[in-house]
UniProtKB/Swiss-Prot annotation:
InterPro entries assigned to the protein according to its UniProt record, in alphabetical order: Anti_VapB2-like, SpoVT-AbrB_dom, SpoVT-AbrB_sf, VapB_TA_antitoxins
Domain SpoVT-AbrB span(s) in chain numbering: 4-44
Name of the protein this chain belongs to: Virulence-associated protein B
Gene transcribed to yield this protein: vapB
PROSITE patterns: SPOVT_ABRB
Gene Ontology molecular function: any one: DNA binding
Pfam family membership, one: MazE_antitoxin
Length: 76
């Protein structure tokens, strides 16, 4: 796992992104997840997914019936 440096520039906090992780774009979407953040290129296929995540309530849980264990034969 790589480590990036966090620093302050003016009134903003910034992260020095290692070369292997640099973006090929001028803008990114930023999304907070718990105590972490996710950066995705602005013009990415993930943009719609991230927008959809914002529609869920913070305490959203999927309720479902417990799975019944399946008995299967060995594959080989």
């Amino acid at each position: 796992m790589k480590v990036a440096k966090v620093f302050t520039t003016g009134r903003s906090q910034a992260v020095r992104i290692p070369k292997a992780f640099q973006f090929d774009t001028k803008e990114v979407i930023i999304q907070r997840f718990g105590n972490g953040i996710l950066l995705i290129p602005k013009n990415s296929d993930w943009q719609g997914f991230l927008e959809a995540l914002n529609e869920f309530e913070p305490d959203f849980k999927i309720e479902r019936e417990p799975q019944i264990e399946q008995v299967r034969e060995d594959f080989l």
